[in-house]
């Protein structure tokens, strides 16, 4: 035997072979045919069961026998894949109308595996036989099987639109399909309307076919998504569980789930809800129970007393498979190719298939009727000359000779002669003659009717309509899925997601933040907070886990951090740097932090920069749903820094102090509300080379403490300040020296809450009591606290 060796590039061989493989799995494995809604393996299973007489009116047979028939004659693949497909056709939570009835364990909605095929038994369902009806009447084309030992159908007659009724799902090379199941009566009604009016619009069709009808029921939201899918083949809907509320004897409420979204694993859903409860992601759930039994699906979610059941339900819709989105992708094989099809195209393809099936069946029946008519006419003729026929047969040598004599003497045809010689003697009665004459009349009427169907397209369509109506009447069922026009917006109260707990929030000047339990805080003391060397406490306060923290930086940005998302860390331990929660720039510094309980308030923030700009923005502007990156609080120009952020419930006085000792006090009412991206207006008229070191709210009982670079502290009372208008130069608070003048490096408004100060140089720090600093007059430079020769030049001061 000679060998032919071809020299081919690997690229060409791979491309060619993968192309063949892709075509095979697209056409022969993963995608359904638009005409019968079946994938090849499903079609082969149903045909194998039908061929072997495993029909609904017979006893159940072992599934292993069917699997053996399928892989032995039609589907040369693994037995597991065939059995898996067979089981799916029997699962009433997967198919709207099952095509196989199965005895034994055929899996569950919990995704439990079915029993082995040697244990289960199956037979065709009554509806499945409507897919195969008339297959023996040459209605569809047959092709040789994989080893040319028998024939198999290319498609089933499919007397109802199975693709829409039972839907399909599958993935192949470059294609995927997701076609939802629908209500059989609605689909047939829509098909009937399409037959009457091929120009019917999708809107008109949707009067009859409302939308998907999932075997698991549920609530479908989004008419627009359904319409889009029916028009283009692609669309999105929301499918949510059916949830009812019950009240228990102890006064508690519980949510009862009786229907879940299509193809959601029930046990996984129960597990997920219980995990949300155990992980305290949702507050208010006592227990989750799966109470499903023979009477139907039932999941009970027992709630705590006085919780908002609607909010818990909404939280579960959003954070579990209690609600899912279903994406239509209606791809099917049409004319040998995968196509994305709208509902009109699917119905049209099905209708064309039915026209062909009914026409082929009519031709087959007409041919048989004409053949029978021919035989009946021969028998009637023979009975009219019965004595001569009998005499001729008796004088013949054998059967063959008798047939030839009948053809030659009486001009019977071959078929008629065969029927005559096979006629039994008891048939030669008057009763039989009358019966033959009656049959002749019936055949005449039948032939006339069949020819009319073939010659008249409307008559053929009427046959299709009549048969569809019969199936509709016989198999119709109530819709299981409720359809709602709009997709409901899910609103979740924060109280449901986060248990309410009072905690201590702390922020250090170097940006370390944490929340600490009241118990841990009380067991220690403010001074015992965990700090890095050189760091100090910027702020600490009692907050609730349902509050939100706004962290402001020198870049004019803010971080929006829900308190419950902060790490729960003991008071004596180091907190978490804000950059680990929300990424910030390397040179970005935290300048203040505030706690918000409710953003629906008249309160406002005031922002002040080093170069003397100021602005006011209302608190509601800062509410956001984005937690993962810094947001703009105010526009900070180049070579400027935000140095102060204040929060006020109402307008009040603020004091601005500059490096060169100027001070201006005015009311925030002079500031207009502005957006977050605004830069603001001029706060103070700065001298050359001067800059702002402090902008803070001030009241009549407050004092102001200032620190100079030379180690001096000066404390003044409110009465020295002169209330003026914004953008003026202000008053002088220092005595100007010609040599080494004092410059204010830090200043703070001192209220009754403050008792200590801390001075910082690059390498040292000095602590003292604020009350030890006597109040000074306006034109003084205060009192020296540290010797800069030993301590170093003062660079900052904090008060606490």
UniProtKB/Swiss-Prot annotation:
**Its domain of life?**
Bacteria
> Listed disulfide bonds for this chain?
none
UniProt keywords (A-Z) are:
Cell membrane, DNA-binding, Isomerase, Membrane, Topoisomerase
Q: Which InterPro entries match?
A: GyrA/parC_rep, Gyrase/topoIV_suA_C, Topo_IIA-like_dom_sf, Topo_IIA_A/C_ab, Topo_IIA_A_a_sf, Topo_IIA_dom_A, TopoIV_A_Gpos, Type_II_DNA_Topoisomerases
A GO molecular function for this record? DNA binding
Query: Would the keyword Oxidoreductase turn up in this protein's UniProt record?
Result: no
The catalytic site is made up of: 119
A Pfam family cross-referenced in the UniProt record is DNA_topoisoIV
Family per similarity comment: Belongs to the type II topoisomerase GyrA/ParC subunit family. ParC type 2 subfamily.
Assembly state and interactors? Heterotetramer composed of ParC and ParE.
Known PANTHER family for this protein? Answer: DNA GYRASE/TOPOISOMERASE SUBUNIT A, DNA TOPOISOMERASE 4 SUBUNIT A
Q: What does this protein do?
A: Topoisomerase IV is essential for chromosome segregation. It relaxes supercoiled DNA. Performs the decatenation events required during the replication of a circular DNA molecule.
**What's the protein called, per UniProt?**
DNA topoisomerase 4 subunit A
Please name the source species: Staphylococcus aureus (strain Mu50 / ATCC 700699)
């Amino acid at each position: 035997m000679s060998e032919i060796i071809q020299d081919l590039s690997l690229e060409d061989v791979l491309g060619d072979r993968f192309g063949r493989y892709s075509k095979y799995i697209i056409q022969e494995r993963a995608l359904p045919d638009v005409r019968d809604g079946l994938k090849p393996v499903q079609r082969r299973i149903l045909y194998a069961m039908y061929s072997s007489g495993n029909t609904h009116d017979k006893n159940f047979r072992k599934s292993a026998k069917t699997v053996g028939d399928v892989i032995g004659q039609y589907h040369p693949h693994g037995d597991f894949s065939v059995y898996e497909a067979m089981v799916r056709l029997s699962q009433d939570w997967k198919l709207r109308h099952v095509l196989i009835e199965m005895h034994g364990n055929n899996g569950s909605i919990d995704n439990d595996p079915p029993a082995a095929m040697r244990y289960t038994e199956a037979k065709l369902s009554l509806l499945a036989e409507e897919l195969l009806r008339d297959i023996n009447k040459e209605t569809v084309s047959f092709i040789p099987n994989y080893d040319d030992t028998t024939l198999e159908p290319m498609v089933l007659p499919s007397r109802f639109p199975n693709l829409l009724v039972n839907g399909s799902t599958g993935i192949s090379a470059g294609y995927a399909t997701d076609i939802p199941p629908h209500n059989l009566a609605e689909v047939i009604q829509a098909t009937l309307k399409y037959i009457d009016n091929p120009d019917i619009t999708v809107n008109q069709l949707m009067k009859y076919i409302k939308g998907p009808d999932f075997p698991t029921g549920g609530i479908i939201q989004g008419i627009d998504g359904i319409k889009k899918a029916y028009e283009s083949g692609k669309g999105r809907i929301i499918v949510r569980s059916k949830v009812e509320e019950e009240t228990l004897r102890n006064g508690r409420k519980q949510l009862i789930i009786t229907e879940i979204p299509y193809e959601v694993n029930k046990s996984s859903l129960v597990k997920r809800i219980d995990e949300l409860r155990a992980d305290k992601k949702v507050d208010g759930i006592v227990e989750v129970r799966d109470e499903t039994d023979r009477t139907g699906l039932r999941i009970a979610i027992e709630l705590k007393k006085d919780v908002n059941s609607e909010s818990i339900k909404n939280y579960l819709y959003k954070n579990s498979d209690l609600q899912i989105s279903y994406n239509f992708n209606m791809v099917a094989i049409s004319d040998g190719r995968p196509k994305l099809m709208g509902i009109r195209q699917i119905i049209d393809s099905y209708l064309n298939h039915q026209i062909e099936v009914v026409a082929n069946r009519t031709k087959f029946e007409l041919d048989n009727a004409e053949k029978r008519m021919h035989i009946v006419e021969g028998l009637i003729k023979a009975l009219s000359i019965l004595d001569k026929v009998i005499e001729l047969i008796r004088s013949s040598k054998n059967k063959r000779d008798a047939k030839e004599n009948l053809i030659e003497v009486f001009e019977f045809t071959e078929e008629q002669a065969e029927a005559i010689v096979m006629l039994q003697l008891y048939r030669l009665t008057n009763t039989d003659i009358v019966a033959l004459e009656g049959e002749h009349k019936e055949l005449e009427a039948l032939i006339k009717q069949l020819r009319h169907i073939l010659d008249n397209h409307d008559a053929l369509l009427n046959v299709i309509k009549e048969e569809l109506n019969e199936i509709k009447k016989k198999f119709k069922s109530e819709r299981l899925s409720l359809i709602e026009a709009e997709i409901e917006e899910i609103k979740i109260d924060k109280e449901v997601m986060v248990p309410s707990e009072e905690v201590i929030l702390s922020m250090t000047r170097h940006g370390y933040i944490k929340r600490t339990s009241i118990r841990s805080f009380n067991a220690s003391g403010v001074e015992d907070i965990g700090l890095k060397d050189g760091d100090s406490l910027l702020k600490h306060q009692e907050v609730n886990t349902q509050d939100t923290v706004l962290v402001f930086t020198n870049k004019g940005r803010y971080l929006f951090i829900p308190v419950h998302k902060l790490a729960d860390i003991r008071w004596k331990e180091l907190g978490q740097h804000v950059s680990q929660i929300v990424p910030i720039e390397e040179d970005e510094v935290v300048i203040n932090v505030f706690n918000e309980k409710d953003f629906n308030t008249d309160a406002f923030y005031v922002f002040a920069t080093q170069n003397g700009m100021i602005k006011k923005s209302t608190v509601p502007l800062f509410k956001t749903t984005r937690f993962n990156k810094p947001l703009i609080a105010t526009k900070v120009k180049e070579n400027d820094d935000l140095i102060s952020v204040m929060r006020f419930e109402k307008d009040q006085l603020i004091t601005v102090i500059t490096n060169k000792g100027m001070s201006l006090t005015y009311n925030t009412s002079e500031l207009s509300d502005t957006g977050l991206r605004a830069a603001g207006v001029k706060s103070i008229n700065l001298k050359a080379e001067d800059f702002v070191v402090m902008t803070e709210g001030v009241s009549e009982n407050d004092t102001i403490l200032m620190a100079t670079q030379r180690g001096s502290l000066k404390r003044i009372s409110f009465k020295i300040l002169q209330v003026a208008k914004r953008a003026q130069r202000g008053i002088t608070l220092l005595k100007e020296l010609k040599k080494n003048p004092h410059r204010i490096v830090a200043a703070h408004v001192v209220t009754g809450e403050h008792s200590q100060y801390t001075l910082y140089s690059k390498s040292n720090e000095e602590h003292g009591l604020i009350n030890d600093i006597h109040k000074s007059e306006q034109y003084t430079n205060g009192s020296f606290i540290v010797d800069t020769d030993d301590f170093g030049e003062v660079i900052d001061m904090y008060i606490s």
